[in-house]
C-alpha cells in the first residue's frame, strides 16, 4: 500500500537548533505533494519548518525574503544543495536535510 507521506530527518547545527526548541534532529513525516499537487521540495520544507516546527519568533535568522538566509549551508544527504538543485530539489523518503549556520557572533 502506497503512503501519502515521506519520512525525512532534518537537522540543525551551528546555533540554528536554538530556533527549533534546542532540538538538533527532527524526524518528520511530510506530505509527498503540496497543496497544488506538486512534489514537495526543499523550498517547501523551509516554509513548513518556519510555519509548523519553529517556535522561535526570530524567523529572520533562518530565512530572508523567503529564501534560506545567506551564511546557512544546506546539505541534502551530505551533498551541498547547490549540486542538487537548491530549493527545487524534490524530497525523497529517508532524505537527510542538514542546515548549518556558518556565521557565529563574537
Swiss-Prot record:
One of its GO terms (cellular component) is cytosol. This is Ubiquitin-related modifier 1. Its main location: cytoplasm. InterPro entries: Beta-grasp_dom_sf, Mopterin_synth/thiamin_S_b, Urm1. Pathway: tRNA modification; 5-methoxycarbonylmethyl-2-thiouridine-tRNA biosynthesis. It comes from Botryotinia fuckeliana (strain B05.10). It is found in: Cytoplasm. There is a cross-link at residue 106 (Glycyl lysine isopeptide (Gly-Lys) (interchain with K-? in acceptor proteins)). The gene is urm1. GO terms for biological process: protein urmylation; tRNA thio-modification; tRNA wobble uridine modification.
Amino acid at each position: 500500500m502506497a503512503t501519502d507521506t515521506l519520512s525525512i530527518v532534518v537537522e540543525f547545527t551551528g546555533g540554528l537548533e536554538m530556533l527549533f526548541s534546542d532540538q538538533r534532529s527532527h524526524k518528520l513525516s511530510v506530505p509527498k505533494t503540496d497543496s497544488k499537487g506538486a512534489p514537495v521540495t526543499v523550498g517547501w520544507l523551509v516554509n513548513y519548518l518556519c510555519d509548523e516546527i519553529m517556535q522561535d519568533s526570530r524567523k529572520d535568522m533562518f530565512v530572508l525574503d523567503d529564501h534560506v538566509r545567506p551564511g546557512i549551508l544546506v546539505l541534502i544527504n551530505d551533498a551541498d544543495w547547490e549540486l542538487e538543485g537548491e530549493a527545487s530539489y524534490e524530497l525523497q523518503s529517508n532524505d537527510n536535510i542538514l542546515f548549518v549556520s556558518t556565521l557565529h557572533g563574537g
